[in-house]
């Protein structure tokens, strides 16, 4: 059976500049990369944006110090707003996060279109401090604000046929000017198995540092899956589709030998062009060891019992 794809002709675009920024990052080398990091003694900027009412705060990063606001909001991968790390923050003003709706479709008993403000009122918001590991071998610690994805999944009542959940980013060349270039086949789509989506660690984020989510970080709604590489976290979500079969996903389609469907953080499975055994924490000079499942093995390893994680990377 053919895999599900987003219903748009944009998926046919040729990804002519696929590796542009990822290669640039590698070419910087250790000395050049240091210039992108905040010095250890630098004073971080204060969080901006409207404050969110948070019901509880949970540290799920083992007491590690959160990455400063300046770095979390100024060093981003969001190709829809540009392919350099600084482009998303420069171009985020074009994104209009209100009004915003999310369409739920597919193998679900309660298909509907949800207003984002109504959606966020359904569930108490939590602040969760998570590690974030990029596939490019850098990392952050981020205090996200959101609600468990699993709570929404259960409320929508998936049918017995639902095995996967796909998340689709907004397709709008005016709001997301990076979509004017065929860097990737737009719109961006990512997916989880339904048991992954229902796991308590999976989060739909609407903010960070207690404030509404900035555009460059995927406003107004993004997926956060802390045991997976960052590209699994779809941003500016407008559609959630429950599916019987595994769907096409953007990076896995574009370069399947480099970006696996599962994308679990695994220091023993290298990217074809660099090691995944160590990472550079933004704000630090020396690399640190990468932890299996990004440090969340105790919580999530059982999801993959019996699965060859070298083949299913």
Swiss-Prot record:
Q: Which residues bind Mo-molybdopterin?
A: 76, 79-80, 134, 169, 217, 222, 233-235
Does the entry feature the keyword Lipid biosynthesis, yes or no?
Answer: no
Cofactor binding summary note:
Binds 1 Mo-molybdopterin (Mo-MPT) cofactor per subunit.
Q: Name one GO molecular function term.
A: molybdopterin cofactor binding
Question: GO annotations under biological process?
Answer: protein repair
* Processing and modification events after translation: Predicted to be exported by the Tat system. The position of the signal peptide cleavage has not been experimentally proven.
Q: List its EC numbers.
A: 1.8.5.-
The UniProt entry's sequence similarity note says: Belongs to the MsrP family.
Listed NCBIfam families: PRK05363.1
UniProt-recorded name of the protein: Protein-methionine-sulfoxide reductase catalytic subunit MsrP
